[in-house]
């Protein structure tokens, strides 16, 4: 019998060790897997590469990992926000490396990884510092830069409802980067507001269970 459920976030994140690359779902403060991130902070895995849209806000989530000095590199599209205090402290101190890319490029690189594609050419960033060191081409009279697929060892994502097979649904805009990260990572871990005892209706499934290694219930909605 397939049952991908874990007792709690602490059990779910046990496979994550030092030096891992970790995709983290969320956009701003919506759809962030706070339960899994808090458990990862408590575990203390170090030298992490965090891939997310933002670089954390306040004291929780990604910010908690930065505060504890567990992050070696951040890959994101929007590192500075009014609440990104811990990222700014670590970055200015030279303790965290940063790779920035346009938001659409970030999403498409992950989608390419999840779809088994070898990368893509995009006009976004052509002729700017973001294109330095990358392959460029002129196609149809327009400049393009090549972007490779972006994968990760793990993805931590937040869903609304899941079943024991790992099928997930999402709540409104809390969906954001979560589905594409679930596909792009080699080992995806989900927290959901509710684990259903019955299979999710196929029309409700956004992320099929084939992409989810494990899931746990974390009822608190940030």
Tell me what each language-model feature is.
Residues 1-222:
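Conserved alpha/beta enzyme-core scaffold
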């Amino acid at each position: 019998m397939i049952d991908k459920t874990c007792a709690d976030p602490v059990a779910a994140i046990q496979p994550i060790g030092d030096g891992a690359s970790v995709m983290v779902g969320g956009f701003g403060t919506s759809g962030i897997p706070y339960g899994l991130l808090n458990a990862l902070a408590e575990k203390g895995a170090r030298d992490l590469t965090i891939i997310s849209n933002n670089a954390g806000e306040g004291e929780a989530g990604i910010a908690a990992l930065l505060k504890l000095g567990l992050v070696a590199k951040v890959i994101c599209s929007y590192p500075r926000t009014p609440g990104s205090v811990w990222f700014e402290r670590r970055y200015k101190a030279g303790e965290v490396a940063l790779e920035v890319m346009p938001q659409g490029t970030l999403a498409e690189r992950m989608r390419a990884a999840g779809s088994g594609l070898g990368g893509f050419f995009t006009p976004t960033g052509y002729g700017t510092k973001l294109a330095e060191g990358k392959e460029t081409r002129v196609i149809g009279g327009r400049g393009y830069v090549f972007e490779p697929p972006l994968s990760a060892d793990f993805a931590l994502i937040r869903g609304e409802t899941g079943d024991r097979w790992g099928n997930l649904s999402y709540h409104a805009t809390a969906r954001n980067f979560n589905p594409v990260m679930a596909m792009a990572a080699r080992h995806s871990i989900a927290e959901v507001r509710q684990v259903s005892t019955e299979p999710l209706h196929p029309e409700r499934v956004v992320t099929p269970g084939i992409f989810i290694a494990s899931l746990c219930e974390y009822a608190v909605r940030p």
